[in-house]
Amino acid sequence: MSSTPGPDPVDVPIRDESIRLGQFLKLANLVESGAEAKPVIADGAVRVNGEVETRRGRQLAAGDVVTLGGLAARVAT
């Protein structure tokens, strides 16, 4: 049984050791643009590791799981 409820996350590789939440949403194709990321984050629709996250600049690292709607993506290096 998975420790994170919800959909199985897709691994999304990043180039650096960390990435900002807004950038990752776009990279993982969870949103179309950075402009679209801002309101969904502000509205509390995004979860990081199961917790609501409202900071677009939140730094994510390998292993973090981001969910939006029915989709999930895991930060991978």
What residue ranges belong to the model's regions?
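Ferredoxin-like alpha/beta domains used as RNA- or RNAP-binding modules
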Residues: M1-L27, R47, R55-T77
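Short, structured beta-strand/loop micro-motifs enriched in basic residues and often containing a Trp
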Residues: D43-E51
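Short, well-ordered loop/turn sites that connect or cap secondary structure elements
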Residues: V40-I41, L60
